[in-house]
Swiss-Prot record:
GO process annotations (BP): B cell adhesion; positive regulation of interleukin-4 production; positive regulation of T cell proliferation
Record topology, Extracellular segments: 89-167
Biological source species: Homo sapiens
UniProt function note: May function in mediating immune cell-cell interactions. May act as a T-cell costimulatory molecule, enhancing anti-CD3-induced proliferation. May play a role in the interaction of dendritic cells with T-cells and the cells of the adaptive immune response.
Domain C-type lectin: 116-167
Protein keywords: Cell membrane, Glycoprotein, Lectin, Membrane, Signal-anchor, Transmembrane, Transmembrane helix
Gene (UniProt): CLECL1P
Record membrane topology: Single-pass type II membrane protein
GO CC entries: plasma membrane
Regions that span the bilayer: 68-88
This protein's name: Putative C-type lectin-like domain family 1
Tissues in which the protein is found: Expressed in spleen, lymph node, and tonsil. Lower expression in peripheral blood, bone marrow, and colon. No expression detected in thymus. Highly expressed in dendritic and B-cells.
Subcellular location field: Cell membrane
Glycosylation sites: 109, 140, 149
């Protein structure tokens, strides 16, 4: 549960500016909890939230009342289910933005984080992104580099893992 919360916080922090311009968010949650009619089957819940543009314009801070309500609903849904699918439609403000409609979809699975990697030199393995440095640095300097890139150091414990990552 703590791991799920950490991933949800990361998603929220990265999308705070997007949420402040959001007019519609839809969530789909797949739950492994047993239902009364189909024991053991997956149940699908859909939650759709429409936020009027006027109510969002009242708040300048992305962590304001509206965003907090949206985040709280997302957090509750994420904790209750296994997979969260979010469909986010944002409001365009500049004339150039209005020419191109924006529809964003985010797929999130708490067992493995599915996302596109930050740059081409990162490797994807089992839904997670890895970057292997070309130069050797101390542990502390490497940790600082990871913190700057919002990532963590990978610890390789056996030769099999090294082969998988072509090290």
């Amino acid at each position: 549960m703590v791991s799920n919360f950490f991933h949800v916080i990361q998603v929220f922090e990265k999308s705070a500016t997007l949420i402040s311009k959001t007019e519609h968010i839809g969530f789909v949650i797949y739950s492994w909890r047993k239902s009364t009619t189909h024991l053991g089957s997956r149940r699908k819940f859909a939650i759709s939230i429409y936020l009027s543009e006027v109510s969002l314009q009242k708040y300048d801070c992305p962590f304001s009342g509206t965003s907090f309500v949206v985040f709280s609903l997302f957090l509750i849904c994420a904790m209750a289910g296994d997979v969260v699918y979010a469909d986010i439609k944002t409001v365009r403000t500049s004339p150039l933005e209005l020419a191109f409609p924006l529809q964003r979809s985010v797929s999130f699975n708490f067992s493995t984080v599915h996302k596109s990697c930050p740059a081409k030199d990162w490797k994807v393995h089992k839904g997670k992104c890895y970057w292997i440095a070309e130069t050797k640095k101390s542990w502390n300097k490497s940790q600082n580099d990871c913190a700057i890139n919002n990532s963590y150091l990978m610890v390789i414990q056996d030769i099999t893992a090294m082969v998988r990552f072509n090290i």
